[in-house]
Amino acid sequence: MYGKIEKIHFVGIGGIGMSGIAEVLLNLGYKVSGSDLKQSDTTDRLASLGGEIRFGHGRENVADVDVVVTSTAVRDDNPEVVEAKRRMIPVIPRAEMLAELMRMKYGIAIAGTHGKTTTTSMVATVLTHGGIDPTIVIGGKLNTLGTNAKLGQGQFLVAEADESDGSFLKLSPTIAVVTNIDADHLDFYTGGIEQIKDTFVDFINKIPFYGLAVLCLEDRNIAEILPRVKKRFVTYGLSSQADIRATHIRLEGGTTSFVAHYKGYRMGEVSFSMPGAHNVLNALACIAVAMELDVPFSQIQEGFATFGGVGRRFQVKGEVNGITVVDDYGHHPAEIRATLAAGKSGWPERRLVVAFQPHRFSRTRELFAEFVTCFYDADVLVLTDIYPAGEAPIEGVSAERLAEEIRKHGQRDVTYVADREALPEHLLTIVQPGDIVLTLGAGNIWQSGEAFLAKLEEARQA
């Protein structure tokens, strides 16, 4: 960045998308400040790296900064945003700052409605093992790093591309991965799936003439836009028509294995510690990126063997008395189906108890019919109230009504517990040894899983 930019302020610095960029900037030597509503492990880490962290939002927080970075969760009437504009300090979206980082490197941007964080984590792990040493900005904590960001010495930057508000169009990556295209964020994409597809086409076609698009042939919407892609691309999937494909898939507990092929040539077996057939596709995307950067297949295999998963993506939190507690970020019906299928395929003999917290009133309304039928792989389902994520309630949209409709559509064991903090006690009354208890959602449902795990431990020691 131009030399006169010295201090960068993040509004909502504790957010998973903001903190990674802030950490990279700190490692680059910039002065970084930020505000958030509460202290967390993330804010503690940034403070330990030299960040100035303040809790609560106030006009005084932007008095001496050169630029203010905001996420989509920050409203225009935020006092720091208002004061920055009054002082004529530039206020930019998170994606614009990520784009600036990407201009310093060759960018590898992973986009798609689902699977971005896992795929980005796989790419980061495999490229690091392959000697590429990329800079990394991920929307989740990579378990082997203990953080969601790292400044690498190599010439590539690996990052997620967030499509939720179209801001990923600010990025100009050299390699663009699209895992899938689905209907989501319909409060922004008022034109529905066709507008979403158009936006992804624009994103793909922004790569330079020497770049590469990596596209999932298993996804119907991606297949439909292929004729509109004007840049070089490779496809991946399970079909024999895909350039990079998987066969002989094995799902055993928390381990996934498959044989990888490139244009009919059998490359070899890949194995990694993360359950679910959907993660085979994520791994194929990673292989495509690594091959483009000439990472030997043997190093790709070794990289996957070291992959330790990512926070809040089928993350095993602990096990007490034969009861395993798992947490997952899934909050869209397609993600929920894939996550529950992963649990069932990996541990077919175990009962799957799911505690789900819907995320956003608007998403619950727009995808209500899909939510009603996406939980059939759950043996026991408990719903708690919707996590608003800053939204106002919408009349007629509630977790209680969703639970009623799920029950009407054939789900046998469905319970509604309004207060999320009451979930741990409720779970204690219904679980039995051998169960997998899965907390599911993009809000704060993970806290209920940790509280439940603590209660199990207390009961064991009593």
Swiss-Prot record:
EC number(s) reported in the record: 6.3.2.8
GO biological process: cell division; cell wall organization; peptidoglycan biosynthetic process; regulation of cell shape
Domain of life: Bacteria
Entry binding sites for ATP: 112-118
Role played: Cell wall formation.
Family in the record: Belongs to the MurCDEF family.
NCBIfam families given in the database record: murC
Protein name: UDP-N-acetylmuramate--L-alanine ligase
Species this protein is from: Geobacter sulfurreducens (strain ATCC 51573 / DSM 12127 / PCA)
Lineage: Bacteria, Pseudomonadati, Thermodesulfobacteriota, Desulfuromonadia, Geobacterales
Gene name of the record: murC
